[in-house]
UniProtKB/Swiss-Prot annotation:
Compartments, record wording: Cytoplasm
Residue ranges with Polar residues bias: 96-112, 295-340, 430-442, 855-866
Location of region: Sufficent for interaction with Dcr-2: 945-1373
Location of region: Disordered: 75-155, 175-340, 425-543, 734-770, 802-866, 880-928, 1320-1359
Protein name per UniProt: Poly(A) RNA polymerase gld-2 homolog B
Phenotype seen when the gene is deleted: Pronuclear migration does not occur in activated eggs. Defects in spindle structures (abnormally shaped spindles, spindle spurs, ectopic spindles associated with lost chromosomes and mispositioning of the meiosis II spindles) correlated with very high frequencies of chromosome non-disjunction and loss. The polar body nuclei do not associate with their normal monastral arrays of microtubules, the sperm aster is reduced in size, and the centrosomes often dissociate from a mitotic spindle that forms in association with the male pronucleus.
Chain ranges of the PAP-associated domain: 1211-1272
Enzyme class (EC, first level): transferase
Regions of compositional bias (Low complexity) in chain numbering: 75-91, 130-152, 180-219, 228-251, 274-284, 443-485, 735-753, 819-844, 880-890, 1320-1341
Keywords: ATP-binding, Cytoplasm, Magnesium, Manganese, Metal-binding, mRNA processing, Nucleotide-binding, RNA-binding, Transferase
Length: 1373
């Protein structure tokens, strides 16, 4: 890289100048170097830049520094093309200069590594060259004269006529050149050194200030004649500009008045810039480095030789090759220059070439360049240079970092640049002049010229340009798209809040353009610039905030100030254009989800712009109409009007659904906010309101919205919510809209600015006749696609597997058209999905919305007269977003129970489906109106698999077999009545679902994005009561690997997991407290830690555990048992109510947990009944319930299963009595209840079970085997006296019920102690004596209060002073 020569020159400044220069120089004599050193020292001592007449250096402190800064700013792009543009004139000068042995080694890259070694990597070679290259005036004059003679001999007609050394001739500048540049040239021309006129040929390069050599006709020799006259002119003149040290006043760098300090600073900058230019030459990909290289070449040519300068003006690739060539042959002229091997053309011909080049470049600029963006970029660098170049120390050490290797692209503005931006001149004025230069290399001579860096000259001819053109083709395409747009509103970008990172080019070319893929461009290439102008112009008049290209509009999280009728916190219009081709930006580089940009988008303007664009985008009819949508719900007398003219103020969202799930109205033709890929969401399909707002501004927890809850609970058809800005109309495919017109009442539409298309727009969530009139439900057309099919809040995974066809084959039990007991994926897992991959991922084949085979939550108020949701009612049909045109399927049923590929299709037994049981299915199963969509709250909130499970909601239809004309009929009727009154209502279920969804949305913040939350427990199984809490399980996002929880032999495995659970729950406890929507936090550090808190709005208590996969599998098992027989749910609910009444249903108080009570009921129905009512699922389907299989993500918590065809015909009353009798006589000491085996197991066997969660000391009083981890679920019942009281309650209840067959008798307090149970009285005395010393199992009296095989009949003693329950409770407490 010709480093030796330069190193010698640069070492002149060092302390050991003489020695180092002698050793470093390769072609210069010692005398010349010494003379240079002496001259420089004299100049420094004098405090002036030169010992000569200070004409040229009169303003050295100012112009020299500015020139240095200019050179630093001018990206090396200039040098790359300019090097190739070196004219034959330069060659002539080079040849003449070759005769001067002192300067042959100083080719373009004379700034090479030797100098870099001592002076760092800088881009300001100019200042150093300027100072260093000023030998004695005599020596300079001699060199100048010699150079002039040589060049005149070679060609007197060179365009570089001004090169005649001592003649201060300044040629006309390029149109791009600024007046300041011309002044600079004139200044340099005044210096007799040499005034290099900016080459007219180099039209693109701003004012080819070849005068750079004028001030520095120095040791480097090379008369100031500047080699750049090349007609190719891509950047050659720019190189000259760079080389013009003192002349280039256009550089924006800070001006140094102190000449000595300026000289020193310039020296460092020069050395740095030269080394930087060497890097630029080496890295052909860096336009900046090349531009610096151009500067170096000119500067080098000033002092060294036109040879070096000519090489600098070559293309990047040839520049490197020439450098190597010159190293090998320092005294020979390289022959690989462009146009140097051909005979010189006359000046007239060159001028003609210039004219042609100018025309071509102007055309290229008009077609491929955005001048405004370049001006912004240059202004940016200018501001940066002003800010960072105030001391030379920074230049020395930071210069190589100032232009990172990839900064062919714009640099992001700093705060200082924001402040400087308004003070800088507008770029629009200069953009017009830039049309003359197609090279668009942001010429340094034009301080604020808008040369786009990526406009590589369409004039240049050579491999270097072709490579660059290939590299920056994407940038050129983008600039073509946005040229007029940027010129139109360039002035608006001077706002201090303009974010430079969103550059005007609009397609992510901010980052390393040469790496951007071809598909990176934001808008279609055929979109006209005029359309873009219209697209952005309205914003300029409305606000001075950032105006982004349409490709930037897909940034997902951006608050918008006063968005037009944009519901929710995220003021975006998520309106997927189904079938739209080429009109939706496909840019994959989205703004960071958490990096909010305050912008305002006029959707109407964007729509007009898109329609006015050169290419006609596919426009959906519903988008053009822009109607005032009035929704008239069936239950509402006053229609709710949605007026797009209103601008609702931005309000804090009171519901996550409004923030992330509510689609905004489709006001514009193009989807300006296409959803980003799910990867940006952390693998989740929903957005977190917390990411953009404080918890206090989020929804009110469980209810999310009272109106939605009321509508969901009562079947109300309200279409508005008090906490939401009215939602705009949803988008439906035109085909579906037409179908919907046939079967549903169109929503009245108001006037619109555009003529309404033939199919009038419809509210997607309006209620069709089928909803209000179930009899007409079947007439509904195929369901419309989800309006949020491509919304980040509603990923494509939500579709039903019916549409996608990805389901694993139809299940054998899915043959009943309307009563098929098939259910989509469980809400219990919907959040964690137990599967984020399943429900929230695009690859999910989960069946969410089927037509008839899918049970739905259809309230059908007219049919049932209540908010009952039958599990067999056809579900609201919404097709899979990826398969929108899937035809309705009335006979065929798709598989259910699949969660993101985790399907249990092989689970169900292969037997013909029996008719739906009357107790579960609705007498009139009717599908919800599918064409118009289901209830509006279903559309607003994320698809909820829970809501589609009617079995989890109240059952109102009395079973046919409830009354069997026997003595137990009254008892059975009472049980059923109490069950209906206590079961989980639809309203409560909705509230719980909204509470879960709130937490699910809330968890989509960076802190908890790797976790998922799922519903478990009685809420999902159907065994819950209306007063029961909601159980949730927190799972890590990566899920539980099947081998992760295998039975580890590690001794501390369980303790480690428990510690992790405590840490995570403690973190959640701290963060949830800040939401101000929960209260009564309590972290229970039990064996399975639980975080308990309560919803303030609805009083719903939440039990949250961490990574408890066993609880998920239990939920899965129990919900299957609940479906197998209609008597299971009523029995479980009644037993739970009974236990709660007698205060024996509290694990914290050493009594039986609800889960243990459920297992006890199931065990009774499995084992104690003859014949049994329930089978043993572990025996029937061992593959589904393998021990150690802890992959909870494979489970579909609401997987349907056929009812079990039991031979047992006993009634509810008979089973309840049998339950009490069975456990009144059960041998709890020796046997354990086992659902896994469908029988009982010896306690000793259970103690020896090998399980990481099993403990020998768990098995004490009440022993119930956990079906999966083989632990004792009733381990909380470890206190003997407490369990004796529990057994007494069982016994007394059995006696009462058997004696009276009246359900009310078991819900009465037990006031008296049985007189024939002296053991109980003895126990009471023992309780008093051993209050603080619990009685061991061996100390208990035999019989234990009636647990023997032959209990003694008891009579009630009304005279007892104290009750058994009160006494035992007092002592136990």
């Amino acid at each position: 890289m010709f480093s030796t020569r330069i190193s010698g020159d640069m070492k002149i400044f060092a302390a050991d100048v003489a020695e180092s220069s002698v050793t470093a120089t390769c072609n210069t004599s010692v005398q010349q170097q010494q003379s240079q050193q002496l001259e420089f020292r004299t100049r420094m001592s004098a405090g002036s830049p030169s010992s000569k007449s200070g004409q040229c250096h009169l303003k050295f402190g100012k112009y020299n520094n500015k020139t240095a800064n200019l050179l630093r700013q001018v990206n090396s792009c200039h040098s790359s093309n300019s090097s190739s543009n070196t004219s034959n004139n330069n060659n002539e000068a080079i040849k003449g200069q070759q005769q001067q042995p002192l300067h042959y080694c100083n080719s373009n890259n004379s700034h090479s590594w030797a100098r870099k070694k001592y002076f760092g990597n800088g881009n300001s070679n100019n200042s150093l060259l300027q100072q260093q290259q000023q030998p004695s005036s005599f020596f300079q004059r001699q060199q100048q004269q010699h150079q002039m003679q040589m060049q005149q001999e070679k060609q007197a007609t060179n365009n570089n006529d001004a090169l005649m050394k001592n003649q201060n001739v300044v040629n006309a500048h390029v149109s791009d050149c600024k007046s300041s540049d011309s002044n600079n040239n004139s200044t340099s021309s005044s210096n007799n050194n040499s005034t290099i006129s900016s080459n007219n040929n180099n039209t693109s390069s701003a004012s080819n200030n070849n005068t750079g050599s004028s001030s520095s006709c120095s040791n480097r020799t090379k008369p100031a004649k500047w080699l750049n006259e090349n007609s190719s002119s891509s950047s050659s003149s720019n190189n000259n500009n760079i080389s013009c040290r003192n002349n280039n006043t256009s550089s924006i760098d800070t001006k140094r008045r102190n000449s000595s300090a300026g000289a020193t600073a310039a020296y460092y900058r020069k050395s740095e810039s030269e080394s930087g230019s060497s890097e630029g030459a080496a890295e052909s990909t860096e336009t900046e480095a090349t531009r610096t290289g151009g500067c170096n070449s000119n500067r080098t040519a000033e002092s060294s030789s036109a040879d070096g300068g000519t090489q600098a003006t070559m293309g990047k690739s040839q520049d490197q090759e020439q450098d190597q060539t010159v190293k090998q042959r320092p005294r020979q002229q390289p022959l690989s220059f462009w146009k140097t091997n051909y005979p010189q053309t006359s000046a007239t011909q060159l001028k003609d070439k210039e004219t042609v080049a100018a025309v071509v470049s102007a055309a290229a600029v008009a077609a491929a360049a955005a001048a405004a963006s370049a001006s912004e970029q240059q202004q940016q660098q200018q501001s940066l240079s002003i800010e960072h170049r105030r001391n030379s120390g920074y230049q020395q050490h930071q210069q190589h970092n100032y232009y990172p290797y990839y900064y062919s692209q714009p640099k992001q503005l700093t705060i200082a640049s924001f402040l400087q931006k308004e003070m800088l001149p507008d770029s629009t004025e200069k953009s017009s002049s830039n049309t003359g230069g197609s090279n668009m290399i942001r010429s340094s001579s034009n301080g604020n010229s808008n040369f786009s860096r990526h406009q590589y000259g369409h004039q240049s001819t050579g491999s270097g340009y072709q490579q660059q053109q290939q590299r920056y083709r994407n940038a050129q395409n983008v600039y073509q798209q946005y040229q007029h747009q940027q010129q139109h509103h360039a002035q608006q970008h001077t706002h201090p809040h303009f974010r430079r990172k969103h550059s005007d080019n609009g397609s992510g070319i901010n980052k390393k353009m040469h790496y951007s893929p071809p598909g990176k461009s934001g808008d279609p290439a055929d979109r006209s610039a005029s359309g873009q102008q219209q697209h952005h112009h309205p914003h300029q008049q409305q606000k001075t905030i950032e105006i982004l290209a349409s490709s930037h509009f897909n940034a997902m999280h951006r608050r918008m100030q006063g968005g037009n009728n944009k519901n929710g916190y995220y003021q975006h219009s998520y309106n997927p254009m189904t079938g739209e081709v080429g009109s939706t930006p496909t840019r994959s580089e989205h703004q960071n989800i958490y990096n909010l940009t305050y912008i305002h988008v006029d959707t109407e303007a964007t729509g007009e712009a898109a329609s006015a664009a050169g290419s006609t985008p596919v426009v959906k009819p519903s988008l053009l109409s822009k109607p005032n949508i009035s929704i008239t719900p069936a239950s509402s007398t006053t229609p709710t009007t949605v007026d797009r003219a209103l601008l609702p103020a931005v309000r804090s969202v009171s519901a996550p659904a409004s923030g992330s799930a509510l689609p905004a109205p489709a006001n514009h033709v193009r989807n300006m906010f296409p959803p980003p890929p799910l990867a940006m969401l952390g693998g989740h399909g929903l957005l977190s309101p917390v990411t953009t707002t404080t918890p206090t501004k989020m929804i009110s927890c469980a209810q999310l919205d009272e109106a939605i809850t009321a509508a969901a609970a009562s079947g109300d058809k309200l279409s508005t919510s008090p906490s939401y800005n009215q939602a705009g109309h949803y988008i439906m495919p035109p085909q579906q809209q037409q179908q919907q017109q046939l079967s549903s009442h169109p929503i009245p539409t108001g006037t619109s600015s555009h003529p309404p298309p033939p199919p009038p727009p419809h509210m997607f969530f309006h209620f069709a006749d089928g909803f209000c009139n179930p009899g007409q439900g079947h007439q509904a057309p195929p369901a419309t696609m989800w309006p949020h099919s491509s919304s980040p809040c509603y990923p494509a995974s939500y579709g039903s597997s019916c549409g996608s066809g990805t389901g694993a084959g139809t299940s054998p039990h899915n043959n009943d058209g309307n009563a098929g007991a098939l259910r989509p994926a469980s809400p219990a897992l919907s959040s964690s999905s137990l599967g984020s991959e399943s429900q929230w991922s695009g690859t999910s084949n989960r069946s969410r919305l089927g037509h008839n085979g899918h049970p739905s939550i259809s309230p059908t108020p007219s049919a049932l007269g209540s908010a009952q949701l039958s599990p067999h009612l056809a579900e609201m049909r919404v097709q899979h977003p990826l398969h929108q045109q899937h035809p309705p399927s009335h006979a065929s049923h798709r598989p259910h129970g699949q969660m993101g590929g985790h399907a249990m299709s092989s689970y169900v037994p292969h037997r013909p489906p029996p008719p739906p049981h009357p107790s579960i299915s609705s007498p009139n199963p009717t599908p919800v109106a599918t064409g118009a969509g289901g209830p509006w709250y279903e559309m607003i909130l994320p698809p909820d698999r829970y809501l589609a499970q009617a079995r989890n909601i109240e059952v109102t239809v009395q079973p046919e077999k409830l009354i069997c004309m026997c003595k137990y009929d009254n008892l059975s009727a009472e049980i059923w009545k109490r069950f209906r009154g206590a079961q989980q209502t639809h309203n409560k279920f909705k509230l719980k679902m909204r509470l879960w969804r709130y937490l699910y949305l809330w968890m989509h913040q960076p802190m908890f994005e790797r976790y998922r939350i799922c519903l478990v427990g009685s809420t999902i199984t159907g065994f819950g009561t209306d007063s029961s809490d909601i159980d949730m399980c927190l799972l890590p996002e990566q899920g539980v690997h099947p081998h992760q929880h295998q039975y580890h032999q590690h001794h501390h495995f369980h303790n480690e997991k428990r510690t992790e659970a405590l840490i995570i729950l403690t973190l959640f406890n701290a963060v949830l407290k800040d939401t101000e929507v929960f209260q009564d936090f309590n972290l229970i550090e039990a064996r399975v830690p639980i975080l308990r808190f309560k919803d303030i709005s609805n009083g719903i208590e939440v039990d949250l555990n961490f990574n408890n996969c066993v609880g998920i599998k239990n939920t899965y098992l129990l919900q299957l048992y609940a479906q197998m027989d209609w008597r299971t749910r009523p029995l479980v609910v009644i037993v739970k109510l009974w236990a709660q009444y007698h205060d024996i249903n509290d694990a914290k108080r050493m009594t039986i947990s609800s889960y243990s009570l459920v297992l006890m009921v199931l065990h009774y129905l499995q084992h104690a009944c003859v014949p049994h009512v329930l089978p043993c699922l572990h025996s029937l389907y061992p593959e589904k319930f393998q021990l150690g299989q802890q992959d909870c993500l494979d489970l579909d918590l609401i997987e349907p299963i056929e009812p079990y065809q039991a031979l047992n015909t006993q009634t509810l009353g008979e089973h309840l009595l049998g339950f009490f009798k069975y456990y009144s006589t059960f041998d709890f000491r020796n046997f354990a209840i086992s659902i896994r085996t469908g029988g009982v197991l010896p306690v000793s066997t259970c103690r020896m079970a090998k399980s990481p969660k099993n403990d020998v000391y768990q098995w004490k009083e009440l022993n119930i085997e956990e079906p999966f981890d083989l632990s004792n679920t009733a381990r909380s019942v470890y206190d003997g006296p407490t369990f004796e009281r529990v057994k007494a309650v069982f016994l007394i209840s059995a006696r009462r019920l058997d004696h009276t067959l009246d359900l009310a008798t078991i819900f009465r307090p037990i006031h008296h102690v049985p007189e024939h149970f002296p053991q109980l009285q003895q126990h009471q005395q023992q309780f008093e004596q051993q209050l603080h010393h619990p009685i061991s199992g061996q100390q208990r009296s035999a019989g234990g209060g009636g647990d023997g095989a032959n209990p003694v009949p008891s009579t009630l003693n009304p005279d007892a002073a104290s009750t058994f329950a009160e006494t035992t409770a007092a002592h136990v407490a």
